[in-house]
């Protein structure tokens, strides 16, 4: 079970965007990376293609961040938190390690 999933609110704990929060828009498990909305923005220079009707220029988009550089945000403590996984009944659930509160309630 993945500890960070699409839709989770995370906080960046290392790198140039340290301290910024955002929602995970995509998880790339084979590379252990996540894409967070409006965090780690990079500029891409694109060439226009008149056959497809696209214009060239400089576009800004989110670049992936390694999953070890983000931590899930706990709204109750308003800090970054660690995630645990435990069995409840017949399914696994994620919980915050600091206060044992369920994430997937």
Curated annotation (Swiss-Prot):
Matching Pfam families: KOW, ribosomal_L24
The alphabetized list of GO BP terms reads: translation
> Does the record's keyword annotation contain Cytoplasm?
no
> Which SMART domains does this UniProt record tie to the protein?
KOW
UniProt keyword terms in alphabetical order: Ribonucleoprotein, Ribosomal protein, RNA-binding, rRNA-binding
Which molecular function GO terms apply here? rRNA binding; structural constituent of ribosome
Record InterPro entries: KOW, Rib_uL2_dom2, Ribosomal_uL24, Ribosomal_uL24_CS, Ribosomal_uL24_KOW, Translation_prot_SH3-like_sf
Q: Which GO terms describe its cellular component?
A: ribonucleoprotein complex; ribosome
- Keyword Membrane found: no
The record's note on quaternary structure and interaction partners says: Part of the 50S ribosomal subunit.
PANTHER family, per database record: MITOCHONDRIAL RIBOSOMAL PROTEIN L24
Member of which family? Belongs to the universal ribosomal protein uL24 family.
What does this chain do?
One of two assembly initiator proteins, it binds directly to the 5'-end of the 23S rRNA, where it nucleates assembly of the 50S subunit.
Q: What name has this protein been given in UniProt?
A: Large ribosomal subunit protein uL24
Q: Which organism is it from?
A: Halorhodospira halophila (strain DSM 244 / SL1)
């Amino acid at each position: 079970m993945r500890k960070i999933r699409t839709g989770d609110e995370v906080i960046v704990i290392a790198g140039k965007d340290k301290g910024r929060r955002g929602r995970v828009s995509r998880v790339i498990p084979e590379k252990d990376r996540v894409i967070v909305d409006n965090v780690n923005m990079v500029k891409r220079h694109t060439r226009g293609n008149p056959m497809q009707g696209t214009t060239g220029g400089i576009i800004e988009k989110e670049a992936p961040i390694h999953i070890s550089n983000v931590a899930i945000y706990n709204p109750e403590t308003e800090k970054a938190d660690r995630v645990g996984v435990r069995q409840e009944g017949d399914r696994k659930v994620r919980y915050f390690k600091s206060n044992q509160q369920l994430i997937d309630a």
